[in-house]
């Protein structure tokens, strides 16, 4: 099976033909990211490190254990107000004005086929071509539930991610920021490849080092636009077209978007993709839901040329609607 769950250690492993993605639920119920890269066969939880780090706060659950801090641990869907001072995937403003959302694991479901997102574009696949993992997280105090959706297209070497946010509390909340995907990396020197442009000169490649601090690209135009492309690659410094580790994020949405790459004080890197947090304040009354547009994740250990080709194959077959039976389509005037 493409999706496996180890009950004893509470570890999820998502496998494609050449890649693996792994995460675990820890003893406090937090969903931690373990690994994304070339295919593996065992547990990668040995990559989690615990040190007493000054000025990195500890949750009350940890008691006197000063080595446990969300400010340094890799997470699947980090939220503001939990002691993690890096960029957040989710920011909720509660009815009392506070901005805190303490998400803990509740349950999960593994099923055949690819999840859908009503009213939004998304990768599509048959029951035999994909599997879905749905993980339910909840902030018990505020009543916020987040369903993390993972679609695994094994033969395409692609994993899709989305999040559905629901207000189960008694009062209205405001979603101030919502990403669909977050990747945390424990160390290493990386560069980010992005594409900028202007009228009549779109899609210019830019490659730059991810230094300490926060790097952001996005659109506030109401459309993904010619200015920046909602697709990035994060690559090791030595990566070329033919060699090197490369990670990709493609946002399946034509509106405002935001991609962030942040290197923290410990040399860890976080990559986020989702809706732009400026000009975005989404109210949710009790029972209402917000679905965050999908991000397609890709990995290649053979350079960004191979990663590009994997995206091409996946998008042509599973995102574009083929109305011509594989034949060339009619001429389109621009």
Range-by-range predicted roles:
Residues 1-12, 265-285:
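Short acidic, Pro/Gly- and aromatic-enriched capping/linker segments at domain boundaries
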Residues 5, 10-13, 17, 21, ...:
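Polysaccharide-binding surfaces and accessory modules of carbohydrate-active proteins
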Residues 21-23, 292, 329-334:
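Hydrophobic faces of well-ordered beta-strands that scaffold small-molecule active sites
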Residues 91-93, 98-107, 282-301:
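Short Pro-Gly-centered flexible turn/kink motifs
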Residues 298-310:
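Short, Lys/Arg- and Gly-enriched loop/turn segments at beta-strand edges
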Residues 310-334:
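An acidic-aromatic substrate-binding cleft motif
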């Amino acid at each position: 099976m493409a999706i496996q769950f180890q009950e004893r250690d509470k570890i999820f492993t998502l496998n494609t033909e050449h890649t693996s993605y792994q995460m675990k639920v820890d003893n406090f119920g937090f969903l931690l990211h373990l690994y994304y890269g070339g295919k593996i066969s065992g547990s990668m939880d040995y990559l989690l490190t615990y040190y007493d780090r000054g000025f990195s706060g500890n949750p009350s659950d940890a008691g006197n254990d000063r080595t446990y801090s969300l400010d340094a641990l890799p997470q699947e869907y980090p939220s503001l107000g939990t002691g993690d001072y890096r960029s957040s995937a989710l920011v909720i403003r509660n009815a009392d004005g506070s901005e805190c959302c303490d998400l803990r694991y509740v349950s999960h479901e593994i099923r055949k086929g690819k999840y859908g997102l009503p009213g939004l574009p998304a990768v599509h696949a048959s029951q035999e071509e994909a599997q879905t993992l749905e993980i339910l997280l909840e902030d018990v105090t505020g009543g916020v539930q987040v369903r993390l959706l993972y679609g695994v297209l094994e033969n395409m070497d692609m994993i899709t991610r989305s999040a559905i946010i629901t207000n189960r509390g008694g009062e209205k909340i405001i979603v101030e920021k919502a990403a669909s995907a977050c990747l945390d990396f424990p160390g290493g020197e990386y560069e980010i490849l992005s594409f900028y442009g202007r009228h009549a000169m779109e899609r210019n490649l830019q490659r730059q080092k991810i230094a300490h601090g926060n790097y952001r690209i996005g659109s506030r135009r109401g459309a993904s636009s010619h200015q920046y492309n909602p697709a990035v690659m994060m690559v090791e410094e030595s990566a070329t077209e033919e060699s090197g580790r490369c990670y990709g994020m493609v946002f399946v949405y034509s509106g405002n978007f935001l991609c962030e790459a942040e290197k923290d004080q410990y040399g860890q890197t976080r990559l986020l993709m989702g809706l732009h947090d400026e000009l975005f304040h989404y109210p949710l009354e009790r029972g209402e839901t917000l679905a965050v547009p999908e991000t397609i994740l890709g990995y290649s250990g053979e350079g960004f040329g191979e990663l590009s080709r994997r995206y091409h194959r996946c998008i042509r077959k599973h995102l574009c609607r083929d109305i011509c039976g594989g034949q060339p389509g009619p001429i389109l005037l621009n």
